[in-house]
Curated annotation (Swiss-Prot):
Belongs to the peptidase C14B family. The lineage of its organism: Eukaryota, Fungi, Dikarya, Ascomycota, Saccharomycotina. Residues 23-34, 49-62 have a biased composition (Low complexity). It is an enzyme of class 3 (hydrolase). The gene is MCA1. This is Metacaspase-1. Involved in cell death (apoptosis). GO terms for molecular function: calcium-dependent cysteine-type endopeptidase activity.
């Protein structure tokens, strides 16, 4: 889901200047700052384009995703989970002194769910609010979350403090991680437009940071991955779990976690030759089609990647982005891919959100490796996007997925 017409963003907005000041609590009343920024809420969503539901309460729960067999659920080729996460401090690296701690997810549970349909805009989406409804029901019905501990930001709500403006999203992120403790389980789910912007601190091999777009992005700008990491990952103590789910374009490393895993359960390493070949092919195709600008853009990207290969030290980046907390991010696609705003079983939905819920509904006892592979398998029948799984620490991909 990417609204821009070029490779990067809507307009080159600078990233936020660090995380916002501390907030004493999420429910502190409406915040009207976006009105001063010139954002004007639509009068209401267009009728009949999504499953409208004005209140998210226990008495009016979203409908669950459809049940039924898919044929993908045989996880024998990846193996069943070896067991729950190990307890205690985990060390890794020779003489590095780095330790982390898995969460058993037995503590407090909180969730922040953000869905942006961008009503009335040229790049309107149809499935993002449905994704939030499905995810909230899924967390309550299957994972022990309580409605009172779930904050929902969507652009169809009457309470202006619950509209997904940039300021409201950042404040809600701060609420999510406030007073986090070991064995807590936190969930951040975003469904909306995503994109990229030029990397300014040298931590991206590609030269681009991932971003998400609030409903008021044209006035307030986007939210960059460096800042999402600073707000939601850095404050977490060892043994606290954060599960981040990104159903958006260019979201492969949207939380800036240092360990990205392949479908074989091993850490991916940057592949300059593969990236260079892709850029060269794109340049050739653009030239053949008479798109000189596109050819120049692809060649420029290739030159930047080659130049940055010597200046970006992966070990240093991993040290800077490492966290002793238990942070997992599952995204809908690679950094250079788009994520589908789709329709499944007659309902508008994000393809990634739909596959995550469907796979776990039909096969709850899965390893991280089988979850990643099953999501890819179910999407491969219709979509080209490839979900990604990244972690704040070296991850045993064969233990049971929990959240």
């Amino acid at each position: 889901m990417f609204p821009g017409s070029g490779h990067n963003t809507y307009g080159g907005y600078p990233p936020p200047q660090g995380p916002p000041p501390n907030n004493n609590g999420y429910n502190s009343g409406p915040n009207n700052s976006y009105r001063q920024q010139g954002y004007s809420r639509p009068q209401g969503p267009p009728p009949g384009q999504y499953d409208q539901q004005s209140q998210y309460s226990q008495q009016s729960q979203p409908s669950a995703p459809p049940q039924g067999g898919t044929g993908y659920g045989d996880q024998s080729q990846w193996g069943r989970p070896t067991g729950p996460p190990p307890s205690g401090s985990q060390s890794f690296g020779q003489n590095s002194g780095y330790t982390f701690q898995y969460s058993n997810c037995s503590g407090r549970k909180k969730a922040l769910l953000v869905g942006v349909n961008y009503f009335g805009s040229p790049n309107e989406l149809r499935g993002c609010i449905n994704d939030v409804k499905n995810m909230s029901s899924f967390l309550v019905d299957h994972w022990g979350y309580q409605w009172n501990d779930i904050v929902i930001l969507t652009d169809d709500q009457n309470d202006i403090s619950r509209v997904p403006t940039k300021n409201n999203i950042i404040r809600a992120m701060q609420w999510l991680v406030k007073d986090a403790r070991p064995n807590d389980s936190l969930v951040f789910h975003y469904s909306g437009h995503g994109g990229t912007t030029a990397d300014t601190d040298g931590d991206e091999e590609s030269g681009y940071d991932d971003v998400i777009y609030p409903v008021d992005f044209q006035q307030a700008g986007h939210i960059v991955d460096d800042d999402m990491h600073a707000i939601m990952v850095r404050p977490l103590p060892p043994g606290c779990r954060l599960t981040a789910l990104y159903d958006s374009c260019h979201s492969g490393t949207a939380l800036d976690l240092p360990y990205v895993y392949s479908t074989k359960g091993v850490v991916k390493e940057p592949n300059l030759l593969k990236d260079a070949g892709s850029d060269a092919l794109n340049a050739f195709i653009s030239y053949e089609r008479g798109n000189i600008g596109g050819a120049i853009s692809s060649l420029t990207g290739l030159v930047k990647k080659v130049a940055r290969q010597g200046s970006t030290n992966q070990d240093q980046v991993r040290q800077a982005k490492f966290s002793a907390a238990d942070v997992i991010s599952i995204s809908g696609c690679k950094d250079d891919q788009t994520s589908a705003d789709a329709k499944e079983n007659g309902r508008a939905t994000g393809a990634m959100s739909w596959s995550f819920i469907k796979v776990l509904n039909e096969l709850p006892n899965q390893s991280y490796l089988s979850l990643l592979n099953n999501m890819r398998t179910i999407l491969a029948a219709k979509y080209s996007q490839k979900p990604q799984l990244s972690c704040s620490h070296p991850q045993d991909m064969n233990i049971q997925f929990i959240m």
